[in-house]
Amino acid sequence: MKHTFAIEDDFYLDGEKLHIISGSIHYFRVVPEYWRDRLLKLKAMGCNTVETYIPWNFHEASKGVFDFTGMRDVEAFVRLAQALGLWVILRPTPYICGEWEFGGLPAWLLREDGIRLRCSDPRYLRHVMDYYDELIPRLVPLQVTHGGPVLMMQVENEYGSYGDDKAYLSTLRDAMRQRGVDVPLVTSDGPENDMLACGKVDGVFQTGNFGSHAKERFAYMTEKGISPLMCMEFWCGWFDHWGNGGHARTDAKSCAREFAELIDLGHVNIYMFHGGTSFGLWNGANDYEALAPDVTSYDYDAPLSEDGRVTEKYRLFKAAIEARTGHPAPEVALTEIPRRAYGQAKETACAPLLSLAAGRESFHGVSPMSMERLGQSLGYTLYRTTLTHEETLRKLQLVDAADRAQVMLNGQVILTLYDRELLSAHTFDTPVPVRPGDRLDILVENMGRVNYSYKLERQRKGIDSAVVINDHQHYGWDMMTLDEEALSAMVPTGCDAPANAPALHSLTFQAPERADTFLALPGWGKGVVWLNGFTLGRFWEKGPQKRLYIPAPLLREGENKLLILETEGRSGEVWLCDEPDLG
């Protein structure tokens, strides 16, 4: 059934006022088998709408190669929401932020020297239009005007915190309209003068993003002539980055009070209702005084936990919705997905990463090249060279390198440099003797591209310039791209993992029946874990996250296979537990 949706003095659906109480669920952070469970729990809390971003890089990981299947099937997610009686807000903006790798932008954009992002640079816009030619026709039939559940779509995301290119915003608006988007278009920005002013574009409705003081925020928006009032992102929690000292939590009662006030004053989208998990290597990062990569979990201290459990915040939000709307939440039969501890996994084989990588195709160059120039976006890049003369290694500098580099001489780590340590030369406390024929390997990890701030364009990964040994540049490098696919295809044999070098470990465990579980890695250092070929995500002893979430659909009844890349030359026990540990 087709509907009309209009923004006037309020939101009107088929001529009747609609009070939007929405919650964010990112389809790309939840296994498809659990979409129904999460959406039903959203409805049962009293929400009438679900909101999601659409990350460009998740759907076009390589230029011109699109994927809208499985976990990427946004159309199926939207249709399921409709079948369950929910309206939908879509945010198909080129940039999403969202604590997601590169804010959703594809890293292959950075292969073009000098390209400017999120502006009217014709090189950037050409790629956006190619993407829209594929994406937007998929979304058009999902609009309420075509019988779907989509009420509105977003043009750009928090652009007022980034730039002021009005021509760019107008181009995005027009591109969506020309491709058939006829529901209202929106933007979302912080409710501050510069942000609202820079993010504004004619013919597009403005919304605000904030986590508290709704009365003051909305009053300011009213002064700027914005009506009706909507908070597109009510931040009810926050995200974690490695080493931040503990899982970010907000007081449930005070958060519920803020939420109740917000419902009284206008329309709201809860960010996040359910955070989910940044599976794979898709976590983003912030970079202020130092790089701060996000952890694998995107629990966000949301009303619904990472594994879909109802929290105190959920119950308080539900009560607030019922009290403010005067209607009880829909009666929805909810299930609690079982958890199970499967015990200790058994290691079956291990091998040095350098040995396993030796047979891979490599690119040869005079000087090192960045991941992006090598056609790689995520993972690790290995730079290998043979030293030609005898000398003493006193000083080493990796020029234009990011994010974390492990320097190995003949297979043994002699130096690890991270983030700001890569900005200058490193002087060895004890000089390292080098002989002709010695092999120098440098393994560089992309720990997550920054997803917010002006630094978006300035973050090629790997080594993008030179390696300076003592006081001279070293030339002649073989470069191997070790992305998720390449690493997960490696098969360790035997049990030969040196104590001071990256290695891959194979393990197995038995699951008599499938249930949610949590992977604990006591004694391990840093790396990535795969389960039955699926990338669960990163681990790091720095915390705060101590266990990785494993949804039941990823398990097999019977034997399950784990592959662990451990970059610190460590090993320990591996346990499958029935409780999370986010720190």
Regions found by a protein language model. Name each.
Residues 64-70, 94-118, 169, 173, ...:
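Aromatic- and acidic-residue-enriched segments that line the glycan-binding/catalytic groove
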Residues 35-101, 173-178:
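Aromatic-lined substrate-binding rim segments of carbohydrate-active enzymes
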Residues 20-32, 56-74, 110-130, 154-165, ...:
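The substrate-binding groove and active-site-proximal loops of carbohydrate-active enzymes
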